[in-house]
Amino acid sequence: MQPKQRILNAPVYQPGKPIDDVKREFGLTEVIKLASNENPFGSSPKAKAAISEQLDNLALYPDGASLNLRWDLADFLGVKPSQLFFGNGSDEILLMISRAFLSEGTNAVMATQTFSQYRSNGIIEGADLIEVPLKDGVHDLEAMAAAINEQTKVVWVCNPNNPSGTIVTTSELEAFMKKTPKDVLVVLDEAYYEYVVDPEYPQTVPMLAEYPNLIILRTFSKIYGLAALRIGYGIASEELISSLEHVREPFNTGTLGQVAARAALKDQEFVKSCRDRNREGMKQFTDSFDEWGLSYYPSQTNFILVDLKMDSDEVFKKLLSQGIIVRSGNALGFPGFQRITIGTKEQNDKILSVLKEIVTGALK
């Protein structure tokens, strides 16, 4: 009994190492996880209160159309409710887009060093992948546009990019969209949208009126701090959203996630506080890296990719032994680098103290 061969060829996603595993492995009582770009400040108290009010309704199926969340989010974004599409995290939307548009004989264009699930979903659907290297850690949109051919169905653009944290600018994206054929779907994955402070970052929702072949993906897993509840969403033309509904599973988002997302959306003070504290934390890292003479990519996210010029897996293991979980650059296509989530001030102080010992050779 064997599944399809191409499924076996698809890489299995490797999440950040679980905290409990590290505690058991190293006999530690305290571990900080700075590996999965989660919000170290948690989630809005309003979201937690909304969840508690639904605990007597767990026997009931959720609203399959996410109607209340749909209306709230449409009002917040200034779009029609019919322009929204919900998934069990934006990961599921990536899967559904791939299922709807990719097949044998087609291809997708993507960056070489970007979010791994674009590649995995393409392989599963039997599509070819055209990978374009990053340019100074940024999507090379000019080269990606040139790579599009008659078999191209989807172009994946992660903005800000994971794992480099870099952005493509408004002018770069507009030039790219003008070059892209109207029958090629451009997927803008904006999972870290709310963290961005760079004024050159594109505001893409208004672009939907001009580009019906554009879909924007965002999530409640990052700055909203609801990663455990898996609520992602897409914004696109009504026609495109309608076509994706054909591949959406029934009841794919849960009641607790829907009510928490509605409450979190209404607490923009919490979002602003998290964004501000994230930039303060980012400065802790960049100031230290500058002092130590280390190179890093300018990040508009809640993580930073730094070149320690050492074996990535060895540094990863040294940090683990000290109760700190990060992501080795070897797993991300950046040997010698580590990707580090920005934590609380105390968490940042801890990892920077250990990194200094590693960089200076004090920690063997």
UniProtKB/Swiss-Prot annotation:
Q: What class of enzyme is it?
A: transferase
Q: Please give the start and end residues of each transmembrane region.
A: none
Query: Residue positions of the PTM N6-(pyridoxal phosphate)lysine?
Result: 222
Task: Give the matching SUPFAM superfamilies.
Answer: PLP-dependent transferases
Q: Which family does it belong to?
A: Belongs to the class-II pyridoxal-phosphate-dependent aminotransferase family. Histidinol-phosphate aminotransferase subfamily.
Quaternary state and interactors: Homodimer.
Instruction: Using the record, list the residue span of the signal peptide; answer none if the entry has no such feature.
Output: none
The coenzyme or cofactor needed here is: pyridoxal 5'-phosphate
Q: Identify the PANTHER family for this entry.
A: HISTIDINOL-PHOSPHATE AMINOTRANSFERASE (PTHR43643:SF3), HISTIDINOL-PHOSPHATE AMINOTRANSFERASE 2 (PTHR43643)
Per the record, the pathway is:
Amino-acid biosynthesis; L-histidine biosynthesis; L-histidine from 5-phospho-alpha-D-ribose 1-diphosphate: step 7/9
One of its GO biological process terms is: L-histidine biosynthetic process
CDD domains the record matches: AAT_like (cd00609)
Keyword field = Amino-acid biosynthesis, Aminotransferase, Histidine biosynthesis, Pyridoxal phosphate, Transferase
| Lineage of the organism | Bacteria, Bacillati, Bacillota, Bacilli, Bacillales
* Record EC number: 2.6.1.9
Under Gene Ontology molecular function, one entry of this record is:
pyridoxal phosphate binding
| Annotated protein name in UniProt | Histidinol-phosphate aminotransferase
